[in-house]
Amino acid sequence: MEEATSISLIPPKNRRIGEIIPENTPIQMATVTDSTGYIHPKWFKFQNEERMIVKIDIERVMCQETVKYAGIFEKRIICSIIVNDIRCVAEFRYNIESQRWRIFQVISS
């Protein structure tokens, strides 16, 4: 991916953060994995509607589990993120077979 561009993510008054961050979209995720296999996400990048690369830091991991959807194993990770001083809860999914990350949904904003 390209170098991250620093842009304002403040949504217009009629849009929520969940509408600014694309849901169910592939992302680039930076993580650290400890000796027990627990994944610690640090930040993620995505391409916004203006085709700019946006980087968002992850504040903390709230929960993590392995789930099976229609025969596909995925890591489901719920994290707290901060976008323009607004704390949000986001759900990320990591497909174990394809080894790809996506932001599944922004749960609250």
Question: Which residue ranges define each predicted feature?
Answer:
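Cysteine-centric segments in proteins
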Residues: M1-S109
